[in-house]
Amino acid sequence: MKALVLEEKGKLSLRDFDIPGGAGSGELGPKDVRIRTHTVGICGSDVHYYTHGKIGHFVVNAPMVLGHEASGTVIETGSDVTHLKIGDRVCMEPGIPDPTSRASKLGIYNVDPAVRFWATPPIHGCLTPEVIHPAAFTYKLPDNVSFAEGAMVEPFAIGMQAALRARIQPGDIAVVTGAGPIGMMVALAALAGGCAKVIVADLAQPKLDIIAAYDGIETINIRERNLAEAVSAATDGWGCDIVFECSGAAPAILGMAKLARPGGAIVLVGMPVDPVPVDIVGLQAKELRVETVFRYANVYDRAVALIASGKVDLKPLISATIPFEDSIAGFDRAVEARETDVKLQIVMPQ
């Protein structure tokens, strides 16, 4: 099958590619479904593998198919699958854990060391015409949720995970540092989770303008205003209940404690490329609770339900739809990191 293949750092190709034992090739297991891929989002991790050839200790040592934010249509079901049928429109959770692991038994399968996650070396991704996937990690899309929205469930699930880790109370005020795609997802999940107001801070005014179109969102351009002073003014000097750090930027991480109220929460979502300093005393002096986020667990069905309900509208965050045959150009556009782009999506031939 033709696939978008990362041959090596900085080199992509569209070519026939055999994926041994999975992602569309091989035999269908009794608990699997075969899916005709429809829409695949371009994620920052895909782009990072393209430009750097690695993320942390995950290194691309051999050609790898990219893509993990996906939706499609079921075209075959395994003999034991009962909740899905041929023709169902679905989205797919891309990380498959070992169900017998201690992490999975604890319900934290996202941190299972044995998890097999699409487009994370050595596991191939889903930018192929068909994939085989466990039915247990495949979710039917309601009729009012499009394929494009279905492919947005994966990044929104990270926002859902962050909102759950924050333990939001109704009426909380939150700050999100970083208005990239994940920062925007976190902001919308925080609103859906009960926050009365979410303040989003970034350097890029075009991104702030996009997220500011949502009710309940206020924005601060930190090129123009001091963030700590602005948050203090917005909260009568008390500070926000929750800080979601989504930029991974060292200055933002160092300044987190100044934004939070005493007894508030810090949720670390963004991933710094290198180790960064943290103001431990600043955290201690306010007895701030610190939470971390790595992917997600047990939130996909909730994410789909929120989108279907209309309480979360992700369509304005889709900046462009790119045909599969132009996907290399799409990735090159993603590398440009245009300030007006949030999510680029690739549509597969049908």
From Swiss-Prot:
The protein's Enzyme Commission number: 1.1.1.9
Enzymatic reactions: xylitol + NAD(+) = D-xylulose + NADH + H(+)
Membrane-spanning intervals of the chain: none
Cofactor comment text: Binds 1 zinc ion per subunit.
Example GO molecular function: zinc ion binding
Domain of life from the UniProt record: Bacteria
InterPro entries: ADH-like_C (IPR013149), ADH-like_N (IPR013154), ADH_Zn_CS (IPR002328), GroES-like_sf (IPR011032), NAD(P)-bd_dom_sf (IPR036291), PKS_ER (IPR020843), SDH-like (IPR045306)
Binding positions (Zn(2+)): 43, 68, 154
UniProt keyword terms in alphabetical order: Metal-binding, NAD, Oxidoreductase, Zinc
This protein's record includes keyword Plastid: no
Keyword field contains Protein transport: no
Cofactor: Zn(2+)
Family: Belongs to the zinc-containing alcohol dehydrogenase family.
Protein known as: Putative D-xylulose reductase
Source species: Agrobacterium fabrum (strain C58 / ATCC 33970) (Agrobacterium tumefaciens (strain C58))
